[in-house]
Protein backbone atom coordinates (compact mmCIF):
# COMPACT_ATOMS: atom_id res chain seq x y z
CA UNK A 1 0.00 0.00 0.00
CA UNK A 2 1.44 3.38 -1.00
CA UNK A 3 2.23 6.28 1.31
CA UNK A 4 -0.72 8.69 1.48
CA UNK A 5 -0.88 11.75 -0.73
CA UNK A 6 -0.94 15.46 0.11
CA UNK A 7 -2.66 16.52 2.30
CA UNK A 8 -2.29 13.54 4.62
CA UNK A 9 -0.30 12.14 7.54
CA UNK A 10 2.75 11.36 5.44
CA UNK A 11 5.08 10.69 8.39
CA UNK A 12 2.84 8.06 9.96
CA UNK A 13 2.01 6.53 6.59
CA UNK A 14 5.72 6.38 5.65
CA UNK A 15 6.49 4.48 8.85
CA UNK A 16 3.70 2.00 8.12
CA UNK A 17 4.88 1.51 4.52
CA UNK A 18 8.62 1.27 5.12
CA UNK A 19 9.00 0.22 8.75
CA UNK A 20 11.48 3.09 9.17
CA UNK A 21 10.89 5.73 11.87
CA UNK A 22 13.71 8.02 10.75
CA UNK A 23 12.45 9.98 7.76
CA UNK A 24 15.76 9.87 5.87
CA UNK A 25 15.69 6.05 6.11
CA UNK A 26 12.06 6.00 4.99
CA UNK A 27 12.90 8.24 2.03
CA UNK A 28 15.72 5.92 0.96
CA UNK A 29 13.39 2.93 1.27
CA UNK A 30 11.06 4.42 -1.36
CA UNK A 31 13.92 5.75 -3.51
CA UNK A 32 13.39 9.50 -3.20
CA UNK A 33 16.21 12.01 -2.84
CA UNK A 34 17.79 12.59 0.58
CA UNK A 35 17.80 15.25 1.93
CA UNK A 36 14.38 16.35 0.77
CA UNK A 37 10.83 17.20 1.78
CA UNK A 38 8.59 14.60 3.39
CA UNK A 39 5.99 15.44 0.76
CA UNK A 40 8.26 13.85 -1.87
CA UNK A 41 7.24 10.47 -0.41
CA UNK A 42 3.54 11.02 -1.15
CA UNK A 43 2.14 8.14 -3.19
CA UNK A 44 5.43 6.19 -3.14
CA UNK A 45 5.81 2.51 -2.27
CA UNK A 46 8.60 0.17 -1.29
CA UNK A 47 9.91 -2.13 -3.98
CA UNK A 48 8.44 -5.62 -4.04
CA UNK A 49 10.78 -8.45 -5.00
CA UNK A 50 10.29 -11.65 -7.00
CA UNK A 51 12.80 -14.33 -8.01
CA UNK A 52 12.04 -16.70 -10.88
CA UNK A 53 14.04 -19.93 -11.14
CA UNK A 54 14.63 -22.24 -14.09
CA UNK A 55 11.52 -23.14 -16.10
CA UNK A 56 11.63 -24.59 -19.63
CA UNK A 57 7.90 -24.18 -20.26
CA UNK A 58 7.26 -20.72 -18.85
CA UNK A 59 3.87 -19.04 -19.16
CA UNK A 60 4.27 -15.25 -19.49
CA UNK A 61 0.91 -14.73 -17.79
CA UNK A 62 2.35 -15.95 -14.48
CA UNK A 63 4.51 -12.84 -14.26
CA UNK A 64 1.93 -10.48 -15.78
CA UNK A 65 -0.68 -11.51 -13.20
CA UNK A 66 1.81 -11.17 -10.34
CA UNK A 67 2.81 -7.65 -11.42
CA UNK A 68 -0.82 -6.55 -11.66
CA UNK A 69 -1.48 -7.90 -8.17
CA UNK A 70 1.16 -5.53 -6.73
CA UNK A 71 -0.84 -2.45 -7.76
CA UNK A 72 1.22 0.70 -8.17
CA UNK A 73 4.23 -0.59 -6.24
CA UNK A 74 7.55 -0.78 -8.08
CA UNK A 75 8.72 -4.34 -8.62
CA UNK A 76 12.15 -5.94 -8.90
CA UNK A 77 12.20 -9.25 -10.78
CA UNK A 78 15.36 -11.37 -10.72
CA UNK A 79 15.76 -14.28 -13.14
CA UNK A 80 17.92 -16.88 -11.38
CA UNK A 81 17.60 -19.82 -13.81
CA UNK A 82 17.12 -20.35 -17.55
CA UNK A 83 13.61 -19.50 -18.76
CA UNK A 84 12.11 -20.82 -22.01
CA UNK A 85 8.71 -19.74 -23.34
CA UNK A 86 5.98 -22.38 -23.51
CA UNK A 87 5.22 -21.50 -27.15
CA UNK A 88 6.78 -19.83 -30.18
CA UNK A 89 3.61 -17.73 -30.34
CA UNK A 90 4.23 -16.19 -26.91
CA UNK A 91 7.19 -14.19 -25.67
CA UNK A 92 8.90 -15.75 -22.68
CA UNK A 93 8.45 -12.50 -20.71
CA UNK A 94 5.90 -9.84 -21.60
CA UNK A 95 5.33 -6.37 -20.16
CA UNK A 96 1.98 -4.88 -21.27
CA UNK A 97 1.45 -1.13 -21.62
CA UNK A 98 -1.21 -0.97 -18.90
CA UNK A 99 0.78 -2.43 -16.01
CA UNK A 100 0.07 -0.33 -12.88
CA UNK A 101 3.55 -0.61 -11.35
CA UNK A 102 5.55 2.59 -10.84
CA UNK A 103 8.47 0.89 -12.57
CA UNK A 104 9.69 -2.63 -13.34
CA UNK A 105 13.30 -3.59 -12.69
CA UNK A 106 14.30 -6.79 -14.52
CA UNK A 107 17.60 -8.39 -13.52
CA UNK A 108 18.95 -11.41 -15.40
CA UNK A 109 21.69 -13.04 -13.38
CA UNK A 110 25.10 -13.97 -14.76
CA UNK A 111 25.06 -17.36 -16.48
CA UNK A 112 21.27 -17.22 -16.98
CA UNK A 113 19.40 -16.90 -20.29
CA UNK A 114 15.84 -15.85 -21.15
CA UNK A 115 14.86 -17.73 -24.34
CA UNK A 116 12.18 -17.53 -26.97
CA UNK A 117 11.17 -21.06 -27.97
CA UNK A 118 12.71 -22.70 -31.04
CA UNK A 119 10.61 -23.31 -34.16
CA UNK A 120 9.60 -26.78 -35.33
CA UNK A 121 11.16 -28.49 -38.33
CA UNK A 122 9.15 -28.81 -41.55
CA UNK A 123 8.02 -32.04 -43.23
CA UNK A 124 6.57 -30.52 -46.40
CA UNK A 125 6.65 -27.52 -48.74
CA UNK A 126 5.93 -25.11 -45.89
CA UNK A 127 8.87 -23.36 -44.26
CA UNK A 128 10.12 -24.46 -40.88
CA UNK A 129 8.48 -22.79 -37.92
CA UNK A 130 9.69 -19.36 -36.86
CA UNK A 131 11.54 -18.98 -33.59
CA UNK A 132 9.80 -17.22 -30.71
CA UNK A 133 10.51 -13.91 -28.97
CA UNK A 134 12.34 -13.78 -25.65
CA UNK A 135 10.96 -10.47 -24.28
CA UNK A 136 8.11 -8.30 -25.56
CA UNK A 137 7.97 -4.84 -24.02
CA UNK A 138 4.99 -2.51 -24.40
CA UNK A 139 5.74 -0.63 -21.15
CA UNK A 140 8.46 1.58 -22.63
CA UNK A 141 11.13 2.87 -20.27
CA UNK A 142 9.05 1.89 -17.25
CA UNK A 143 10.86 -1.42 -17.83
CA UNK A 144 14.51 -1.27 -16.76
CA UNK A 145 16.67 -4.19 -17.89
CA UNK A 146 19.96 -5.13 -16.26
CA UNK A 147 21.10 -8.07 -18.36
CA UNK A 148 24.05 -9.73 -16.67
CA UNK A 149 23.34 -12.96 -18.59
CA UNK A 150 21.79 -13.39 -22.04
CA UNK A 151 18.54 -12.75 -23.91
CA UNK A 152 18.00 -15.09 -26.87
CA UNK A 153 15.39 -15.32 -29.59
CA UNK A 154 14.47 -18.88 -30.56
CA UNK A 155 16.11 -20.48 -33.58
CA UNK A 156 14.04 -21.17 -36.68
CA UNK A 157 13.05 -24.73 -37.61
CA UNK A 158 14.78 -26.43 -40.53
CA UNK A 159 13.17 -26.76 -43.95
CA UNK A 160 12.33 -30.14 -45.50
CA UNK A 161 13.49 -31.95 -48.66
CA UNK A 162 11.70 -34.45 -50.90
CA UNK A 163 11.98 -36.37 -54.18
CA UNK A 164 8.41 -35.33 -55.04
CA UNK A 165 6.47 -32.13 -54.49
CA UNK A 166 3.82 -34.15 -52.65
CA UNK A 167 6.41 -34.88 -49.93
CA UNK A 168 5.59 -38.59 -49.53
CA UNK A 169 6.75 -40.31 -46.36
CA UNK A 170 9.03 -42.68 -48.25
CA UNK A 171 10.88 -39.91 -50.08
CA UNK A 172 11.15 -36.96 -47.71
CA UNK A 173 13.42 -35.68 -44.95
CA UNK A 174 12.23 -33.57 -42.02
CA UNK A 175 13.90 -30.41 -40.75
CA UNK A 176 15.65 -30.12 -37.42
CA UNK A 177 14.11 -28.25 -34.52
CA UNK A 178 15.32 -24.75 -33.64
CA UNK A 179 17.11 -24.18 -30.35
CA UNK A 180 15.77 -24.43 -27.72
CA UNK A 181 13.29 -27.32 -27.76
CA UNK A 182 12.00 -27.00 -31.31
CA UNK A 183 10.52 -30.32 -32.45
CA UNK A 184 12.14 -32.03 -35.42
CA UNK A 185 10.01 -32.81 -38.48
CA UNK A 186 8.96 -36.45 -38.12
CA UNK A 187 8.86 -38.72 -41.19
CA UNK A 188 6.88 -41.72 -39.98
CA UNK A 189 8.98 -43.67 -37.49
CA UNK A 190 12.22 -43.32 -39.48
CA UNK A 191 14.87 -41.77 -37.25
CA UNK A 192 17.27 -41.18 -40.17
CA UNK A 193 14.83 -39.29 -42.39
CA UNK A 194 13.28 -37.43 -39.45
CA UNK A 195 14.73 -34.24 -38.06
CA UNK A 196 15.93 -34.37 -34.47
CA UNK A 197 14.52 -32.32 -31.62
CA UNK A 198 16.51 -29.40 -30.26
CA UNK A 199 17.65 -29.29 -26.65
CA UNK A 200 18.35 -26.34 -24.38
CA UNK A 201 21.95 -26.23 -25.59
CA UNK A 202 21.85 -27.53 -29.19
CA UNK A 203 19.75 -27.11 -32.32
CA UNK A 204 18.26 -30.19 -33.99
CA UNK A 205 19.71 -31.65 -37.18
CA UNK A 206 17.79 -32.32 -40.38
CA UNK A 207 17.11 -35.83 -41.65
CA UNK A 208 19.35 -36.93 -44.51
CA UNK A 209 19.94 -39.50 -47.25
CA UNK A 210 23.06 -39.83 -49.42
CA UNK A 211 21.61 -37.57 -52.13
CA UNK A 212 19.57 -34.95 -50.27
CA UNK A 213 18.56 -33.79 -46.84
CA UNK A 214 16.56 -31.38 -44.74
CA UNK A 215 17.86 -28.22 -43.12
CA UNK A 216 19.21 -28.06 -39.62
CA UNK A 217 17.39 -26.07 -36.98
CA UNK A 218 18.77 -22.63 -36.20
CA UNK A 219 20.82 -21.80 -33.14
CA UNK A 220 19.45 -19.07 -30.87
CA UNK A 221 18.85 -15.85 -32.77
CA UNK A 222 19.40 -17.59 -36.14
CA UNK A 223 17.12 -18.89 -38.88
CA UNK A 224 16.75 -22.56 -39.77
CA UNK A 225 18.51 -24.04 -42.79
CA UNK A 226 16.85 -24.85 -46.11
CA UNK A 227 16.60 -28.42 -47.37
CA UNK A 228 19.30 -29.36 -49.86
CA UNK A 229 20.05 -31.68 -52.79
CA UNK A 230 20.00 -31.77 -56.61
CA UNK A 231 16.75 -32.18 -58.50
CA UNK A 232 14.71 -32.36 -55.30
CA UNK A 233 12.02 -30.20 -53.74
CA UNK A 234 13.05 -28.18 -50.70
CA UNK A 235 11.43 -25.75 -48.30
CA UNK A 236 12.85 -22.76 -46.46
CA UNK A 237 13.96 -22.73 -42.87
CA UNK A 238 12.01 -20.71 -40.33
CA UNK A 239 13.00 -17.18 -39.33
CA UNK A 240 14.91 -16.39 -36.17
CA UNK A 241 13.03 -15.14 -33.14
CA UNK A 242 13.81 -11.70 -31.70
CA UNK A 243 15.51 -11.06 -28.39
CA UNK A 244 13.43 -7.98 -27.48
CA UNK A 245 10.46 -6.55 -29.41
CA UNK A 246 7.99 -3.70 -28.88
CA UNK A 247 9.25 -0.48 -27.28
CA UNK A 248 12.81 0.17 -26.17
CA UNK A 249 13.25 -0.35 -22.41
CA UNK A 250 15.67 1.53 -20.18
CA UNK A 251 18.81 -0.53 -20.85
CA UNK A 252 20.94 -0.43 -17.71
CA UNK A 253 23.12 -3.23 -19.10
CA UNK A 254 22.53 -4.70 -22.55
CA UNK A 255 24.62 -7.81 -21.91
CA UNK A 256 24.66 -10.69 -24.39
CA UNK A 257 21.93 -10.60 -27.04
CA UNK A 258 21.03 -13.25 -29.64
CA UNK A 259 18.61 -11.90 -32.23
CA UNK A 260 17.24 -8.43 -32.89
CA UNK A 261 16.34 -5.99 -30.12
CA UNK A 262 14.77 -2.59 -29.66
From Swiss-Prot:
It is found in: Virion. The record marks 9, 22, 37 as: Interaction with the fiber protein p37. A motif (GRM 6) lies at residues 193-199. Keywords: Host-virus interaction, Viral attachment to host cell, Viral tail fiber protein, Viral tail protein, Virion, Virus entry into host cell. A motif (GRM 7) lies at residues 201-211. A motif (GRM 10) lies at residues 229-242. The keyword Transmembrane does not apply. A motif (GRM 8) lies at residues 213-219. A motif (GRM 5) lies at residues 182-188. One of its GO terms (cellular component) is virus tail, fiber. Receptor binding protein (RBP) that is at the tip of the long tail fibers and serves as the phage recognition site for the attachment host receptor. Probably uses the host receptors OmpF and TTR. This phage use outer membrane proteins ompF and TTR as receptors. The N-terminus is involved in binding to the fiber protein p37. The C-terminus contains glycine-rich motifs (GRM) and mediates the host specificity. The glycine-rich motifs assemble into a 3-layered PG(II) sandwich domain. Belongs to the receptor-recognizing protein gp38 family. This is Receptor-recognizing protein gp38. It comes from Enterobacteria phage T2 (Bacteriophage T2).
Amino acid sequence: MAIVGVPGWIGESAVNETGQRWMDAAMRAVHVSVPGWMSSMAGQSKEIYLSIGANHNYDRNSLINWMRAQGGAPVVITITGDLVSNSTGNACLEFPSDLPNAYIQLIINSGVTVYGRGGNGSTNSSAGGNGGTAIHNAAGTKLRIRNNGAIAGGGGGGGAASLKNSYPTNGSCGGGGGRPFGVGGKIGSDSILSGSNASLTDAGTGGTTFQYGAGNGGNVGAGGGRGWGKNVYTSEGGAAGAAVTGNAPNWQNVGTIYGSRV
